[in-house]
Amino acid sequence: QSTPAFYFVDAVRLPSGYTTPAKADPLGTRVQRVEPLGATPQADHSAHPPFDVNAIRRDFPILRERVNGKPLVWFDNAATTHKPQSVIDRISYFYEHENSNIHRAAHELAARATDAYEGARERVKKFINAPDVNEVIFVRGTTEAINLVAKSWGGQHIGAGDEIIVSNLEHHANIVPWQQLAAAKGAKIRVIPVDDSGQVLLDEYKKLLNDRTKIVSVTQVSNALGTVVPVKQIVELAHRAGAKALVDGAQSISHMRVDVQDIGADFFVFSGHKVFGPTGIGVVWGKREVLEDMPPWQGGGNMIADVTFEKTVYQPIPNKFEAGTGNIADAVGLGAAIDYVNRVGIENIARYEHELLVYGMAQLRTIPGVRLIGTADDKASVMSFVLAGYTTEEVGQALNDEGIAVRTGHHCAQPILRRFGVETTVRPSLAFYNTFEEIDRLIAVVRRLASVRRVG
């Protein structure tokens, strides 16, 4: 089993008193922490220069907001991330100096806009280590990305009696499009179960694979629990069974290094707004030979090479899948967000966020009445919980009163919450601009509620 991408040889910097024992990876190239999240870690504080979270925070203007008279604490990063000033400025610059439609004019602004748009595509290609820039398709977000694959690839390759595998962890966006396809084609959805920690059961997954399996579509990180899924193994097993594989990277793209060639999936999808970029822009990456075999799922301008009343000849990829005027400015903004993440360093981000997660989970475990939902050893970002005596909405409101933003509800992932016997959770979710002090503010509120917990 490969080591999760957010584990590193280097030790981490933690609050005073925390240290992290580690065990060598079998390959000898990485170190994987052996304690479950929340156990006392060991750290060599000299291993890294300090991660200057205060410098990072100055780059995000919205973090200077006050809510109910208190400094904003943004713990709703699994829903959306905030934007650094450089992204805001880049979008403004586009509208001030480059605004034009792309690809279809000889004038200067069209050339500028096209260069900016295609430059963003190149940035995405490098960020996810795609082999070919033309394999990067811009869409509105992860939801549209999965729908594109389900409608185009699925519509062509799924038939009656075929099977589609998803995991119990999936966001509704990675369930409903496949259900719609299965209903239309007479296919069947199979579900990979999870254990009591929220990690997928690979042995049970292997039992689901057969010659009727056509595609396996799984998240890399659960939006509801934070579980990091062993997607590389899942993809390898799917391919051995002759199936295609899609990985939903909406919740992984901002937390760990993504290498689509290493993962090996046929499709990888994500949203810009989950990686400090704008809303309304996302990515489908697909293997060239798979994309070239797929029909376009929308028709219109930009995706055509020639149109007569008798037939249409389509552009090659990626334009074949980008009908009409795309979200040019926000694609450029996504490119700027990737530049920002690259400057900070995704390894630095992953390391620091893991410190926060270990600390936050440990603190929540000390509060009477708190039940953590999702305790897999391999986690990223998310700390879902319920508090005895309170609805999740009541906890969320109490936190909001103190300026702390968390998501409460089912998080568009009802099946996995019901697996744990709950309908909703409180979901603080972390990003690299959060601090230990902010976690302490959250813990203080939850501890206060627990101290006056209602019974019955």
Predicted region positions:
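Pyridoxal 5′-phosphate
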Residues: 1-456
